[in-house]
Amino acid sequence: MKLKQRVVLLAILLVIFIFTKVFLIDNLDTSAANREDQRAFHRMMTGLRVELAPKLDHTLQSPWEIAAQWVVPREVYPEETPELGAVMHAMATKKIIKADVGYKGTQLKALLILEGGQKVVFKPKRYSRDHVVEGEPYAGYDRHNAEVAAFHLDRILGFHRAPLVVGRFVNLRTEIKPVATEQLLSTFLTVGNNTCFYGKCYYCRETEPACADGDIMEGSVTLWLPDVWPLQKHRHPWGRTYREGKLARWEYDESYCDAVKKTSPYDSGPRLLDIIDTAVFDYLIGNADRHHYESFQDDEGASMLILLDNAKSFGNPSLDERSILAPLYQCCIIRVSTWNRLNYLKNGVLKSALKSAMAHDPISPVLSDPHLDAVDQRLLSVLATVKQCTDQFGMDTVLVEDRMPLSHL
């Protein structure tokens, strides 16, 4: 063989060798990441059922101090939380020492302070479990049970970006009225034999109060985030106009994601991928009302998108509002870890996991079976949407590796 031919052959072999090494290394990295995702999934499934128990083992701290220490820029609570049941038990049972009207917003809520000084948001029951909310996908009152279910879905998806939520029964006559501010107390009334209140908010009306069953009111309690983590509000780039006949740009411009990618904080960092995660989360729960979102202040785009205010969910199990997935199908990217978790949850696993996670909540059953079935069905639509993206652009473009370290943040 001539020298020139040998050189060419050696060059070809060298290129093949390099590509083989790169391919194998990439495959090993991906396999290692997949194995870690699988281990995380098994850890989640093992600790899924949270039994509300008062005892805190091996600590002199209050449940409120423990929950406050969990918060970091990319998580509200960690993956493994042996004290979770004790914290949620405290949320569901601790004495209410003050009750006031809710913070800003359009929907009825009350701001409670529990023994030990912990703030929580109380959202009252407005509908029975089998009630179907008709109309626009964002129609109706807030659903307290949706807050509970959304928190547990956040756990199951491995996001850890939703504040803790638990169901609670309160006696309006003996637990709320004696410690209520004058502003809240002035909104109480009696309808038949039931104690009711209508609070203070944009849509709150005396003609539309929330009523207890006698004096006992069912609701949800959301743990207030620590004051050392002030929030910053952002307009959601895929928010709706809420005006009849007026479309938002994303509703008619299929290249809208390209414009979003050129604006801060979506041009770098994790925020755009958080938007995609949130679109998946909101689609599964049927929440078409995320017009704004919160992150921690002064985060320069590094903070997570916090999954607050999920009560406009689980309204109609027969309605799958595909437009909620617009960030996903317009950007055609998703985290590898999210994609892996979604695949682990198919074939009925998601429904079973969600039902199991909520089994010990004080207001269980939290969701009706049609809503649980709907979550499973919507998961298939999410997977199909990602498949369409990978068919069009390829796996390497669509699936993004973005595992951010948490402990040092």
Curated annotation (Swiss-Prot):
It is a single-pass type II membrane protein. Residues 1-6 are cytoplasmic. Disulfide bonds join C196-C211, C201-C204, C257-C331, C332-C389. It is found in: Golgi apparatus membrane. ATP binds at Q107, K123, T222, L223, W224, L225, E294, D309. InterPro entries: FAM20, FAM20_C. Pfam families: Fam20C. Responsible for the 2-O-phosphorylation of xylose in the glycosaminoglycan-protein linkage region of proteoglycans thereby regulating the amount of mature GAG chains. Sulfated glycosaminoglycans (GAGs), including heparan sulfate and chondroitin sulfate, are synthesized on the so-called common GAG-protein linkage region (GlcUAbeta1-3Galbeta1-3Galbeta1-4Xylbeta1-O-Ser) of core proteins, which is formed by the stepwise addition of monosaccharide residues by the respective specific glycosyltransferases. Belongs to the FAM20 family. This is Glycosaminoglycan xylosylkinase. It comes from Homo sapiens. The lineage of its organism: Eukaryota, Metazoa, Chordata, Craniata, Vertebrata.
